[in-house]
């Protein structure tokens, strides 16, 4: 099938921002002006098209990255029609996984900043993630109509706090309630958008006299930035003192794609000003799939291969999101890097080794969809009903296998017990949690062996709140949730030898199992090891796996406080048996008894998870932040200067970190942010351990 849009005219972009920068309203306006959306959805009244999960509408924050396709030919229809695929990304610290996975499949991004709040902590986190994937960016300073709006101040913060090189290509005309439009520094014209057409129409006027000097100054800086793109442009600029308009755009484009500059624009999405020109900038300065480096992967013969953005190459795509849809069931969102795929084709999942037949293919527009017959290089689409695909899997041509670089997903750090409010909902709850875990690799579900409770684990308190909320809304399962729990472990501090004997001989066939174990502590992270040193058949070899099994089950159930026993070596070195009464069950129980008694005598201790915490804080709050970390039993490992103040690195027990996000926010007026990941297990202090053991008895 012929392409409707040449791949050179594709733009795969993300809209990334801090929570309140106005990202969803900006995306809404994009959909409106590109003719997809005919009613303006406002976050304020919770009707935004992109935010298609009910909860997002309630909380006013964007959680899932919905993928949307739209078309644009420029404000004045000055470009041939381009196809823009937009991925909306969340801006909350608990959803960094969503941001990671969308950045992984984007070619460029528009970073939205609030003209009043400027660069917020979360902007720094998202910016770092975009640096990791080398994503070219534009900056859109939104909310120019708000009190306290200051475009150039925010541009300064992008330079100082994010270490980027922003180049204004517009200057605002007025600010706050007097914000009227923008000056286009390339054409040197003032742009005013028409209120009655909701900004669909605009007119170009002369630059207001009071802005002329400022516009000349920033135009000069912009042209210098463009001239640095190549020797040829620099020579022309030095000879003529000027550059033609086409060369300015060409130079800015080259440097943006190389990640050397960030063109900066401004507007007010809410007031329908500026988004139209920002869309023009997406066409002018963001890359097409052909302009980003080919994607690399591992081929069937273990050598490195790559795929170029071409329909002629073998098919290769990355599944970046799984979502369940109330109408069509399972949706797998994927980005096509090379080749063509038609519905009815078979693909190979290089991660799992399974083959999948492709049924329906959908082009998504936030919450409506259009069925399509095939997808091509550069497309972002969704497949319906794929069975065994998870986030990060590679789908490829079965005859040309390649495994694209996987996304890295963090380990969950917090868990809660969850149970349905009514017994009849148990099965529905299991199905719901299973589906949610497939959608989100940073969310895990397991059953606690001893209590039979269902335990869910995730990246933070808000993350788990939202999971429980989605169960209620999408699966109609009401659940009770326990308090957040820390994943403690148990181990021993000294070696010991211990006998375990299980004898039942009262009429009929009895039970007889008898073992001697040596238990020894192992280094951290070694786990459980079983060694068989039986000589002379004192324990027949058919019963030895049963001893191991009995010990293993006991390690999972814990000894002193019900937490798994780790880093321990159990050596079976002696025992005895009975010709008739010995059985696997008897030896399993004997092994378990010996292990349990031995651990109790071998100076058992409780281990607690220690988190690596990194806090980025303005210097004036450093003392407060460090004092607070010390109160939380934290050990400060080091400090360094950062673009936005100080970075404090510390190791803190997870048990002390609950509620930290809220405390840090209030202690620093929301200006500090932190990241936290698991580091290691350390012995818990005796007063802490004592309280936990007592609670478990």
Swiss-Prot record:
- Which terms are listed as keywords in the entry? Cytoplasm, Elongation factor, GTP-binding, Nucleotide-binding, Protein biosynthesis
- List the record's Gene Ontology CC terms alphabetically: cytoplasm
Q: Which GO terms describe its molecular function?
A: GTP binding; GTPase activity; guanosine tetraphosphate binding; translation elongation factor activity
Plastid as UniProt keyword = no
| Compartment(s) where it occurs, according to its Swiss-Prot or TrEMBL record | Cytoplasm
- Entry's transmembrane regions: none
Record-linked CDD domains: EF-G (cd01886), EFG_III (cd16262), EFG_mtEFG1_IV (cd01434), EFG_mtEFG_C (cd03713), EFG_mtEFG_II (cd04088)
What Pfam families does the record point to?
A: EFG_C (PF00679), EFG_III (PF14492), EFG_IV (PF03764), GTP_EFTU (PF00009), GTP_EFTU_D2 (PF03144)
Please name the InterPro entries in this protein's record: EFG_II, EFG_III, EFG_III/V, EFG_IV, EFG_V, EFG_V-like, EFTu-like_2, G_TR_CS
Domain (tr-type G) spans 8-290
Q: Name one GO biological process term.
A: ribosome disassembly
- What Gene3D superfamilies does the record point to? 3.30.230.10, 3.30.70.240, Elongation Factor G (Translational Gtpase), domain 3, P-loop containing nucleotide triphosphate hydrolases, Translation factors
| SMART domains registered for this protein in UniProt | EFG_C, EFG_IV
- Give the binding site residues for GTP: 17-24, 88-92, 142-145
| PANTHER family, A to Z | RIBOSOME-RELEASING FACTOR 2, MITOCHONDRIAL, TRANSLATION ELONGATION FACTOR G-RELATED
Similarity field: Belongs to the TRAFAC class translation factor GTPase superfamily. Classic translation factor GTPase family. EF-G/EF-2 subfamily.
Functional note: Catalyzes the GTP-dependent ribosomal translocation step during translation elongation. During this step, the ribosome changes from the pre-translocational (PRE) to the post-translocational (POST) state as the newly formed A-site-bound peptidyl-tRNA and P-site-bound deacylated tRNA move to the P and E sites, respectively. Catalyzes the coordinated movement of the two tRNA molecules, the mRNA and conformational changes in the ribosome.
Protein name as catalogued: Elongation factor G
Q: What is the lineage of its organism?
A: Bacteria, Pseudomonadati, Pseudomonadota, Gammaproteobacteria, Chromatiales
Gene symbol?
fusA
């Amino acid at each position: 099938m012929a392409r409707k849009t040449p791949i050179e005219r594709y733009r795969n972009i993300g809209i990334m921002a801090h929570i309140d920068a106005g990202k969803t309203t900006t995306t809404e306006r994009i959909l409106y002006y590109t003719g997809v959306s005919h009613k303006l959805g406002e976050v304020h009244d919770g009707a935004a098209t992109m935010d298609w999960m009910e909860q997002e509408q309630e909380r006013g924050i964007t959680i899932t990255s919905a993928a949307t396709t739209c078309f644009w030919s420029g404000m004045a229809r000055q470009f041939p029609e381009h196809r823009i695929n937009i991925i909306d990304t969340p801006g909350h610290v608990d959803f960094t996984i969503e941001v990671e996975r969308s950045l992984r499949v984007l070619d460029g991004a528009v970073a939205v900043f609030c003209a009043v709040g400027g660069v917020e902590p979360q902007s720094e986190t998202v910016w770092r993630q975009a640096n990791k994937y080398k994503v070219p960016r534009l900056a859109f300073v939104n909310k120019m109509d708000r009190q306290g709006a200051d475009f150039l101040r925010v541009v300064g913060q992008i330079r100082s706090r994010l270490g980027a090189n922003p180049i204004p290509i517009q200057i605002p005309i007025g600010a706050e309630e007097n914000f009227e439009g923008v000056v286009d520094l390339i054409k040197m014209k003032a742009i005013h958008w028409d209120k009655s057409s909701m900004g669909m129409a605009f007119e170009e006027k002369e630059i207001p006299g009071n802005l002329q000097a400022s516009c000349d100054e920033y135009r000069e800086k912009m042209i210098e930035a463009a001239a640095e793109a190549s020797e040829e442009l620099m020579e022309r600029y030095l000879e003529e003192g000027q550059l033609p308009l086409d060369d300015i755009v060409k130079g800015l484009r080259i440097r943006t794609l190389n990640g050397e500059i960030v063109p900066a624009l401004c507007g007010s999405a809410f007031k329908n000003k500026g988004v139209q020109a920002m869309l023009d900038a997406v066409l002018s300065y963001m890359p097409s799939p052909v302009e980003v480096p080919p994607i690399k992967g591992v081929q069937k013969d273990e050598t490195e291969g790559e795929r170029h953005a071409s329909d002629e190459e073998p098919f290769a795509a990355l599944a970046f999101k799984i979502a369940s849809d109330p109408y069509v069931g399972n949706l797998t969102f994927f980005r096509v890097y090379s080749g063509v795929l038609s519905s009815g084709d078979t693909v190979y999942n290089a991660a799992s080794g399974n083959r999948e037949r492709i049924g329906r293919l959908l082009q998504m527009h936030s919450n409506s969809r259009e069925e399509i017959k095939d997808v091509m290089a550069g497309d972002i689409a969704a497949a319906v009903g794929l069975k065994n695909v998870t986030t990060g899997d590679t789908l490829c041509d079965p005859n040309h296998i390649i495994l694209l670089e996987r996304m890295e997903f963090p380990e969950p750090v917090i868990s809660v017990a969850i149970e349905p409010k009514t017994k009849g909902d148990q099965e529905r709850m299991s199905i719901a949690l299973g589906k949610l875990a497939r959608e989100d690799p940073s969310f895990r579900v397991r059953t606690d062996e001893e209590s039979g409770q269902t335990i869910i684990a995730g990246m933070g308190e808000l993350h788990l709140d939202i999971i429980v909320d989605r169960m209620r809304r999408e699966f109609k399962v009401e659940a009770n949730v326990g308090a957040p729990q820390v994943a403690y472990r148990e181990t021993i501090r000294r070696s010991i030898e211990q006998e375990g004997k299980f004898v039942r001989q009262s009429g009929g066939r009895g039970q007889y199992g008898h073992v001697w174990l040596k238990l020894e502590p192992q280094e951290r992270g070694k786990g459980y090891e079983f060694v068989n040193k039986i000589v002379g058949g004192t324990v027949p070899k058919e019963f030895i796996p049963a001893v191991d099994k009995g010990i293993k089950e006991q390690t999972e159930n814990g000894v002193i406080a019900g937490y798994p026993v780790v880093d321990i070596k159990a050596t079976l070195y002696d025992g005895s048996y009975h010709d008739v009464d010995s059985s696997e069950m008897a030896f399993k129980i004997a092994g378990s008894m010996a292990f349990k008694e031995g651990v109790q005598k071998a100076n058992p201790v409780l281990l607690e998870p220690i988190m690596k915490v990194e806090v980025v804080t303005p210097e004036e709050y450093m003392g407060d932040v460090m004092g607070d970390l010390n109160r939380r039993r934290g050990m400060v490992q080091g400090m360094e200067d950062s673009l936005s103040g100080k970075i404090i690195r510390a190791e803190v027990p997870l048990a002390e970190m609950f509620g930290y996000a809220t405390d840090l926010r209030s202690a620093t007026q929301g200006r500090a942010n932190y990241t936290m990941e698991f580091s290691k297990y350390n012995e818990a202090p005796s007063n802490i351990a004592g309280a936990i053991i007592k609670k478990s008895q």
